[in-house]
Structure formats: structure tokens, C-alpha cells
Amino acid sequence: EKKYFSGAPEHLKSVRREFPQIPILRKDFLLDPYQVLEARAWGASAVLAIVACLQPAQLIGLLSSARKGFLDVLVEVHNAKELETALESGAKIIGVNNRNLKDFSVDIRTSFEIARLLEKEQGYCLIAESGLSERNQLLELQDAGFQGFLIGSHFMNNQNPGELLAKLVAG
């Protein structure tokens, strides 16, 4: 998505050519199953579905299209109501966005609140998104049940993102 994420189809294609084995997420505002097919054609292995931007039927359609195209779907939620919609739609990979889409404030307690709602559930992969910049945050979230992290602007706003990643991972 060009306007909000500064992305373009060529970015996905070039990353796929350079790194044929790594998972690649199309981070975009997907509204139509056709966009899932585009993602597959461009080299993505997963797509983002933001519950706040979709009707339940749209989410189900995106999930169905992704399954047919052998793509994973990172279903993004911001609160308990959106989590319920995601689960009812059959989502298995749940991304908890700590950024409030209305005022862009960030609160990582959102991730912990959603994790508590899922603590008795099994078969879900939890990914924490936004506002993550410290190793101790990642360790605490991992202890709460998160299996992955989507960290974007923290790396993109740094001159040496690789070095920053090494510090984040190694401590």
C-alpha cells in the first residue's frame, strides 16, 4: 500500500527474488479476495487482514481466498470485540496491534489484555504488533504467550536496522 505503508508490488517481487525461502507478509489494507490473489502472484506468503477495516463476511472471504492460495493470514485485532470476530471467522494467526488507529497512541498493555482472553485457548499463534522497541518487552510478551512480533517503524527509523535487530534479539 503506497499511501500509508510506502509499499509497491515491486517491493514484494524483489524481496521474493532475493530471498526465495523466507516468509513475506503483504502489509496492506486488504478489502477484496482479489488482493489476496495479487499478493500470491507478487510473492507474498502471508497477508494482513485488519478486523477494524472489514465486515465479518469480508474477513471470512479473505481467509477463504488465502487458504485456496496457500497463504497465511495475519488477522489484526485491537480489542476483545475484534478478537471475537477474528475467532468466529476462523483466524489462526492473531496479531494484536498496540497502536490505536483513531489517535495513533501506543499501549502494549493491549497485547497482554488480548493474551489473557486467549490463555485457555489452543491452536492460535499470537503476534504482538507496534510499539515494541526493548528486549524486555519481547521477553514479557513471549512469557504471556506471544510467538512472534511485528516491528516496523522502530527499525525503519534507524540508520542501522540490522544492528538494532541484533541488539533486540541478543540483549
Residue ranges and their predicted role:
Residues 1-3, 29, 52, 78-80, ...:
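Active-site beta-loop-alpha junctions enriched in small/polar residues
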Residues 111, 115-129, 133-134, 152:
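Catalytic alpha/beta core domains of metabolic enzymes, predominantly
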Residues 1-74, 82, 111-114:
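N-terminal active-site wall of soluble small-molecule enzyme domains
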Residues 18-22, 41-47, 67-71, 88-95, ...:
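Glycine-enriched alpha-helix->loop->beta-strand junction motifs that scaffold or abut catalytic
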Residues 38-58, 95-104, 146-165:
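Glycine-rich phosphate-binding active-site loops on the catalytic face of alpha/beta enzymes
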Residues 31-43, 78-89, 128, 132-151:
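Catalytic cores of alpha/beta
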Residues 108-117, 142, 157-171:
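C-terminal helical cap(s) of enzyme catalytic domains, especially alpha/beta-barrels
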Residues 1-7, 87-116:
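Glycine/Thr-rich beta-alpha phosphate-binding loop at enzyme active sites
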